[in-house]
Every structure is written in C-alpha cells, then in structure tokens.
Amino acid sequence: MEVILLDKIAKLGGLGDKVSVKSGYARNYLLPQGKAVFASEANVEHFEARRADIEAKLADVLATAEARAAKVVALAEVTIASKSGDEGKLFGSIGTRDIADAITEAGVEITKAEVRLPLGAIRETGEFEIAIHLHHDVDTSIKVVVIAEA
C-alpha cells in the first residue's frame, strides 16, 4: 500500500516521502495516528498545498522539544526518596512514572512515556543516568539520585 508520510518515521522516511508499507501497518498504525495518508492523486495534490503548514507545525514541535531538553539539562539532577533496607535495596522500585513525576515537580513537564529505562525499574539507592526521549530528533539525559527515606 502506498502512503504519504506526514511525519518523520524511524526506518521508514521523512515528511512528504511516498513509501510502500504493508496494509496492516498503514491501517492500524500510520493512518489512525495521523502519521500518513493514502497516496491517491487527490491526497498528493492536497499534501503539496499544505506542505508548508505541516513543515511549520513540525518545526514548532521540534523547537518546543529542544526547549524542554534545555530545561532538563539545566536541571542537572533530581532526587527521589524511597523506603529502603539496610543494604540499599528499595522496598518496591522506582519506575518511569516516579521519575517523570519527580522531574515535573522540579519544573520541567515530562510524561512517563518520555522516560527510558532500558534496564528496567530502579531497585536500589544510588545515582543513575536516565535517558529522556522528547522527540524523535531530541534525546537528553538526567541524573536521578535515589536516597533512603528517613
């Protein structure tokens, strides 16, 4: 199935690219998410007419993500207190939601979907470098310090 991409899609293409994808991927993901339209002649003409508007909107989203990344870098580190045992093992764990809430409380709006924990939840006290994925072109990181709650 031929579609026109309305956004940059990893390993597929960028804005305005006409690509061939499996019909299920187009019907179940690209089209409902608004990331692509069918590549009919009418849609091609309509897209070319709106191309500047779409590019401006994407540039605005990118600029917003870069501004948020600068705020995260300026924040440098965030501290989370959690109950733990004598050896530094936490009672429970610190997940993406906890980290996102701590960063948001520190003044930078972050959602749990933007926090990346490739090794899973944090289960001990210490300092951890956490990746933050704000946009497909904007990644940053922040130091999370987990301390024992008094």
Swiss-Prot record:
One of its GO terms (biological process) is translation. InterPro entries: Ribosomal_bL9, Ribosomal_bL9/RNase_H1_N, Ribosomal_bL9_bac/chp, Ribosomal_bL9_C, Ribosomal_bL9_C_sf, Ribosomal_bL9_N, Ribosomal_bL9_N_sf. Keywords: Ribonucleoprotein, Ribosomal protein, RNA-binding, rRNA-binding. Pfam families: Ribosomal_L9_C (PF03948), Ribosomal_L9_N (PF01281). Coiled coil: none annotated. Gene3D superfamilies: Ribosomal protein L9, C-terminal domain (3.10.430.100), Ribosomal protein L9, N-terminal domain (3.40.5.10). GO terms for molecular function: rRNA binding; structural constituent of ribosome. One of its GO terms (cellular component) is ribosome. Binds to the 23S rRNA. Belongs to the bacterial ribosomal protein bL9 family. This is Large ribosomal subunit protein bL9. It comes from Colwellia psychrerythraea (strain 34H / ATCC BAA-681) (Vibrio psychroerythus). The lineage of its organism: Bacteria, Pseudomonadati, Pseudomonadota, Gammaproteobacteria, Alteromonadales.
